[in-house]
């Protein structure tokens, strides 16, 4: 069987749009562009910390995103070291924390930034004598879970 150029063009013009549509999300339920009054965001009091959630959901490009602020008491840690699929960044606002990444400890103070890749074993704790406050930005699979 031989296909002419014309038949090929007709065939491809029907195939490529279908492929492109399959690549698009079925529904755009991404986080909308907005602004937030930080002092009006609710504070959750957890067992080992206080947390103020800023954003949680999907980006328009499909990645999961979660952003929150955590305050740890002196000596406190939100949880034991762990790992997960998404990557995380910490932006330290107040206090002194120790970020452990794959067994190596890093001390971060206000203005310090920490980052872990997907599946790196990590944990954070307040090693100071005053509360420590930091922002967490999580991006990737499961960040919005």
PLM ranges: what are they?
Residues 118-143:
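Ligand-binding loop in jelly-roll beta-barrel domains
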Residues 43, 53, 67-71, 89, ...:
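Conserved hydrophobic/aromatic beta-strand scaffold that supports enzyme active sites
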Residues 68-83:
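Conserved short histidine dyad/triad with adjacent acidic residue
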Residues 3-64, 144-145:
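A short, N-terminal "cap"/entry segment at the start of jelly-roll beta-barrel domains
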Residues 71, 84-98:
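Short, conserved beta-strand element in jelly-roll/cupin
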Residues 69, 101-103, 126, 136:
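Residue-level recognition of conserved beta-strand positions in structured domain cores
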Residues 104-118:
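Short acidic-glycine-tyrosine-enriched beta hairpin
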Residues 77-79, 98, 114, 118-124:
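Histidine-centered metal-chelating micro-motifs
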